[in-house]
Amino acid sequence: MSPPLVIKNGTVVNEDGMFKADVLVKNGIIVEVSPKIIALPEMEIIDATDRLVIPGGIDPHTHMQMPYAGEVTKDDFLRGTQAAVAGGTTMIIDFCCPDHRNGESLMAGYARWRSWADPKVCCDYGLSVAITQWRPETADQMAVITSPEFGVNSFKFYMAYEGTLMVRDDEMYRAMQECAKLRALARVHAENGSVIKEREIDLLAKGVTGPEGHTQSRPEEIEAEATNRACVLAAQANCPVYIVHVMTKGAAAAISHHRAQGSIVFGEPIAAGLALDGSHYYNEDWLHAARYVMSPPLSRDPTTPELLMKLLAAGELHLTGTDNCTYDGCQKSLGKGNFTKIPNGINGVEDRMSVVWEKGVHSGIIDPMRYVSITSATAAKIFNIYPKKGRIAVGSDADIVIFNPNATRTISAETHHHNLDFNIFEGIKCHGVAEITISRGRIVWANGQLQTVPGSGKFVPLLANSPFVFSSHEIREKKKEPRIVERLE
């Protein structure tokens, strides 16, 4: 157990306020937040003068060590969480994808992910489970895995990757009905996989084989249409829905429309979509272009990143993730001659906190309190771990970042901590640097050096029925009860 720790002279930032205060940590928990805490000899002292003391980031969207199509993502749970803490993130929510098509149950897939993660993680983590096929036993398995014993409160549905991960509309609707019963959140990758497949065939037949084919096979309307459809299906099932990696204006507009109709919809843009655009797919260097291949692709509209940040500021979008899913140059090169074979995925877990500060706070679009909301607090609320996570307060876990808003760093693959030979943010200069990262009261990053211990992070059960998501569910359910007309025979 780490010694007691006192953070002196900093400015505490929560989603609802900023104030000067010291912070005392004992046994991994914040035990006091007040001015001028007296440091005792046995305490470790951190001087946070001119620094912000913020909740550790929560990245709600990662794919560490994920097997897919014969490849495995390069960031395993060790390197991925090392990269996370180096950037100021102290918890990830990773996606577990059971091999449904070979008969693997949700529980068996969950156990496989836990066996990979538990010995390696350097920060806390939770799991979200993908449902890629509906079977007669799926509903029962969903009920089991949302129990406190397993601690899963969300399920992911892919509307893309036909033949592997994609679910049909009827399967997703049936699963959303079960989510509603279990008070579990539906999370959706919104694309039209059937149309994409046909467009891929057409493009290849016309000789389009390079990475530019990836974005051409996925027009922005495809994401907008699927986002709207996911929201419609969720509304019919009375199921709150969370749209992952919102990349385009049309998808964001669909979310805003359904929220205006009273639906419970959350939108998650990612660091890549807030900083980059799709011009990279047309780079003359094949490998450069391939490195940016992800789904949905980056927007071809260069004004989209700023608009997404403004929608975060306005509350029309709600939190930020990364979709950290790393494949190196050799893996990307498997798609030479056929863009559909390029593994989809990019980095982000290390750079999200700086990128969001640069594009949001330093650009004058959001304030530091909104920054905390979209990088940690809202995720903690959605996944039912607030205020244990996502807040600097007595009783909260001591997941804390000493953040220097005035420092700068230039992102580079030469200095990052990913197990990756490139960085999609290469050369971007960011204001806002996580100088010290504290996980459960233990310093894991300081002075530009990792101080991590594999396995020191813990699995955090994510319990169903988050009040932030489901507090109005029963009332909504009653309003949706069918009407029966009594008629004289």
UniProtKB/Swiss-Prot annotation:
Catalytic activity, reaction form: 5,6-dihydrouracil + H2O = 3-(carbamoylamino)propanoate + H(+)
Kindly provide the PTM information from the record: Carboxylation allows a single lysine to coordinate two zinc ions.
Any one GO CC term of this protein is: cytosol
Q: Which family does it belong to?
A: Belongs to the metallo-dependent hydrolases superfamily. Hydantoinase/dihydropyrimidinase family.
Q: What is this protein called?
A: Dihydropyrimidinase 1
Where's it found, cell-wise?
Nucleus
The residues the entry assigns to the signal sequence are none
Q: Which UniProt keywords apply?
A: Hydrolase, Metal-binding, Nucleus, Zinc
Question: What interactions and quaternary structure are annotated?
Answer: Homotetramer.
Say if the entry is tagged with keyword Metal-binding: yes
Q: Which cofactor does it need?
A: Zn(2+)
**Biological process according to GO:** pyrimidine nucleobase catabolic process
Question: Could you tell me which residues carry N6-carboxylysine?
Answer: 156
In this chain, substrate is annotated as bound at 161, 295, 344
Q: Which positions does UniProt annotate for Zn(2+) 1 binding?
A: 61, 63, 156, 323
Where is Zn(2+) 2 bound in this sequence?
A: 156, 189, 245
In terms of InterPro entries, this protein maps to: Amidohydro-rel, Hydantoinase/dihydroPyrase, Metal-dep_hydrolase_composite, Metal_Hydrolase, Metallo-dep_Hydrolases_sf
Per the UniProt record, the source organism is: Caenorhabditis briggsae
One of the entry's Gene Ontology molecular-function terms is: metal ion binding
The UniProt note on the cofactor reads as follows: Binds 2 Zn(2+) ions per subunit.
List the cysteine pairs that form cystine: none
Annotated EC: 3.5.2.2
